[in-house]
Amino acid sequence: MALSRRLRLRLCARLPDFFLLLLFRGCVIEAVNLKSSNRNPVVHEFESVELSCIITDSQTNDPRIEWKKIQDGQTTYVYFDNKIQGDLAGRTDVFGKTSLRIWNVTRSDSAIYRCEVVALNDRKEVDELTIELIVQVKPVAPVCRVPKAVPVGKAATLQCQESEGYPRPYYSWYRNDVPLPTDSRANPRFQNSSFHVNSETGTLVFSAVHKEDSGQYYCIASNDAGAARCEGQDMEVYDLNIAGIIGGVLVVLIVLAVITMGICCAYRRGCFISSKQDGESYKSPGKHEGVNYIRTSEEGDFRHKSSFVI
């Protein structure tokens, strides 16, 4: 008797919890709810990816499912009226009734995708969730610019650029297949060099080159999707020939002096005068035949005298 009385008391004490549980379950079942196994999938270009959208609770046997793509402020349909739409047609299918599988993804597939479910038999008829898809792109061979020759003690800049990779790649430089540190002072092996590598911009800057900096240089662009390198290019560091430079300057000065003296001598000899008039070379106008010129008493007054020639 005492045992059955205690059991009845326990059951009575638990009755309110039981009814609350039924009420709670009724509320959940009457509202459609969604979940995803991965809200932020990351995939490499040309691979496949699943966009998970799972109905956890619903009383509607055949809810309406729609997928939309949100990119650059524009919203387009991906799955509507039980059909794949837009540029995903032909490489996307539906699995698990509400989830999407995209084959051969491209960089243009990077976007926010929204799964929308309408369950008309549920008290809460609509639920939605968003998934952000990131497509990583492997870098292509970067463009490298390496000076062919630099004099000792001068500054030099080597450049490396790549524009296809996503996320944005980082850069590393190699000399004769040996990786260069970001700062030459950080490695005793490069104590005779003075350079700095910017892994974000891809520049390798020498403040002053030394003979030891001669060699073959190449750059590698890397990100989470892969890496690519440019072809190696040689850079020669040479000594300045001071004696040769001084000799060349002297030769130029001597040549200029000789040319100047030649011009002066030619000018003195009259080579640059086109015509010359003096007393010896001047000729008076010839007399006209049949006309005599008679000077009168007044200076410079001339008059004509006619004559006949028989």
Curated annotation (Swiss-Prot):
Predominant location: membrane
Positions of the Ig-like C2-type domain: 139-236
Comment on protein domains: The Ig-like V-type domain mediates interaction with JAM2.
The gene coding this protein: Jam3
Family to which the UniProt record says this protein belongs: Belongs to the immunoglobulin superfamily.
SMART domains documented for this protein: IG, IGc2, IGv
Disulfide links within the chain: C53-C115, C160-C219
Annotated signal peptide: 1-31
Function (record text): Junctional adhesion protein that mediates heterotypic cell-cell interactions with its cognate receptor JAM2 to regulate different cellular processes. Plays a role in homing and mobilization of hematopoietic stem and progenitor cells within the bone marrow. At the surface of bone marrow stromal cells, it contributes to the retention of the hematopoietic stem and progenitor cells expressing JAM3. Plays a central role in leukocytes extravasation by facilitating transmigration through the endothelium.
Protein name: Junctional adhesion molecule C
PANTHER family referenced in this protein's UniProt entry, alphabetically: JUNCTIONAL ADHESION MOLECULE C
Regions crossing the membrane: 242-262
Keywords (A to Z) from UniProt: Cell adhesion, Cell junction, Cell membrane, Differentiation, Disulfide bond, Glycoprotein, Immunoglobulin domain, Lipoprotein, Membrane, Palmitate, Secreted, Signal, Spermatogenesis, Tight junction, Transmembrane, Transmembrane helix
Subunit structure comment from the entry: Interacts with ITGAM. Interacts with GORASP2.
Gene Ontology terms, MF aspect: cell-cell adhesion mediator activity; identical protein binding; integrin binding; protein heterodimerization activity; protein homodimerization activity
UniProt-annotated glycosylation sites, renumbered to this chain: N104, N192
Domain Ig-like V-type: 35-127
Taxonomic classification: Eukaryota, Metazoa, Chordata, Craniata, Vertebrata
Recorded topology in the membrane: Single-pass type I membrane protein
